[in-house]
């Protein structure tokens, strides 16, 4: 359904500039609640700034500050968007360079110019190196400040921004930083039909080649259980994707699906047509993939490390994030978080719960009988009450 607007659709032969698709249709970002929320944000303050335990590039434990800036959002979302991404909820269309510099200054002041923080992660709900999203002068500020302060820098980018020209410019300011790419799946069918990513696995390969040419570190994001995929398929596919990208990635960050408001996956979840992954599946994924990143069974920082495997379950233990029965969730999430730092499978010793039998049965069912993809039974409450008609 088209929204009323003073300007209509651009017709063939008309030289007028066309409106964005999100201005023309009732996309989630154009709903009244989304518009009201966007305009309520103070553009001079970042979305959030916080510190977490991390590992330096040479394997030493450290503290890292994460700066999530409030921006215009991702250019891919302007025209289409990924099925799972709700980062548009934290954006404002009118953010400019002055606003971004004010946000950056606020982040530095909050952590005393990042004193005691070995690493700075800068996230923009899009790509820092995309000129359509982020003014070039602000890109330069982030790159230069982190270089002059001696901080390890991590930024995010889609593949299309990582041209030789752009990387040559960026490395002339900061010659040593990490670029995190949201690949999500090393599978073109999944990228197109499950995720709607807007690029191919081959485009990731080419981007990584260019990053390595400029001696930049590569962090690869993979999605666990994208929409329209069963629990067992998610586990089997993700192990294969880890194996496919490990040699080219300094770090692999697995992002278990969490439900973000106003997205395709949100609608599926509300209609009981999708359920986030089990925490047990994440433990199994780590156990099946550890030998890929540590062929000799080592720990993070050991000589056998090919890549570092990281999982930080967003909303872990909650219904809209990876969860189990509710009794064991906290303990399992904590073990997964510890593994991300230590790289030790011993973190999972002694973990058990009655719900593990139900999880195992679900995997068996997924592999033996046809079921609606990604649904699965609820894991909490009485099964009799869940199945009873309302």
Task: Go through each PLM region and give its residues.
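Core AdoMet radical
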Residues: 86-103, 107-134, 145-162, 176-204, ...
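Canonical Radical SAM [4Fe-4S] cluster-binding loop centered on the CxxxCxxC motif
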Residues: 41, 45-102
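Active-site glycine- and acidic-residue-rich loops that bind
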Residues: 160-163, 196-198, 227-240, 275-280
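Active-site-proximal loop/turn and secondary-structure-junction residues that shape catalytic pockets
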Residues: 126-128, 159-161, 185-187, 224-228, ...
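Auxiliary Fe-S-binding modules of radical SAM enzymes
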Residues: 1-45, 259-390
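Distinct, well-ordered alpha-helical segments
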Residues: 132-140, 163-172, 231-232
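Acidic (Asp/Glu)-rich catalytic clusters
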Residues: 108-115, 142-148, 168-176, 209-215, ...
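Conserved C-terminal portion of the radical SAM core fold
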Residues: 202-263, 283-313
């Amino acid at each position: 359904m088209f929204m009323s607007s003073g300007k209509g659709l651009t017709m063939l032969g008309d030289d007028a500039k066309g409106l964005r698709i999100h201005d023309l249709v009732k996309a989630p970002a154009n709903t009244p609640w989304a518009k009201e929320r966007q305009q309520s944000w103070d553009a001079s303050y970042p979305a959030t700034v916080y510190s977490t335990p991390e590992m330096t590039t040479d394997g030493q434990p450290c503290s890292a500050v994460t700066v999530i800036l409030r921006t215009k959002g991702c250019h891919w979302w302007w025209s289409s968007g990924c099925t799972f991404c709700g980062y548009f909820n934290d954006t404002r269309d009118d953010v400019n360079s002055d606003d971004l510099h004010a946000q950056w200054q606020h982040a530095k002041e909050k952590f005393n110019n990042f004193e005691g923080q070995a690493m700075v992660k800068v996230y923009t709900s899009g790509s820092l190196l995309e000129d359509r999203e982020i003014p070039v002068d602000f890109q330069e500020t982030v790159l230069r400040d982190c270089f002059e302060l001696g901080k390890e820098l991590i930024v995010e980018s889609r593949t299309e921004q990582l041209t030789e020209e752009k990387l040559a410019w960026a490395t002339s300011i900061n010659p040593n930083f990490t670029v995190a790419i949201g690949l999500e799946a090393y599978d073109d069918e999944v990228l197109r039909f499950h995720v709607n990513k807007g690029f191919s696995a081959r485009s990731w390969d080419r981007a990584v080649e260019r990053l390595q040419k400029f001696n930049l570190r590569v962090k690869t994001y993979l999605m666990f259980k994208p929409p329209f995929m069963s629990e067992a398929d998610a586990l089997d596919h993700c192990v294969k994707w880890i194996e496919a990208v490990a040699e080219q990635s300094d770090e692999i960050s697995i992002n278990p699906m969490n439900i973000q408001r106003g997205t395709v996956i949100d609608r599926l979840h509300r209609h009981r047509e999708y359920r986030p992954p089990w925490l047990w599946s994440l433990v199994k994924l780590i156990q099946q993939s550890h030998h890929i990143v540590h062929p000799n069974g080592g720990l993070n920082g050991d000589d056998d490390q090919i890549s570092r495997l990281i999982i930080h379950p967003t909303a872990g233990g909650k219904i809209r994030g990876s969860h189990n029965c509710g009794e064991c969730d906290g303990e399992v999430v904590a073990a997964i978080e510890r593994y991300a730092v230590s790289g030790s499978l011993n973190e999972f010793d002694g973990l058990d719960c009655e719900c593990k039998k139900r999880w195992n049965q679900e995997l068996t069912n997924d592999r033996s009988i046809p079921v609606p993809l990604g649904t699965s039974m609820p894991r909490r409450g009485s099964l009799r009450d869940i199945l009873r008609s309302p």
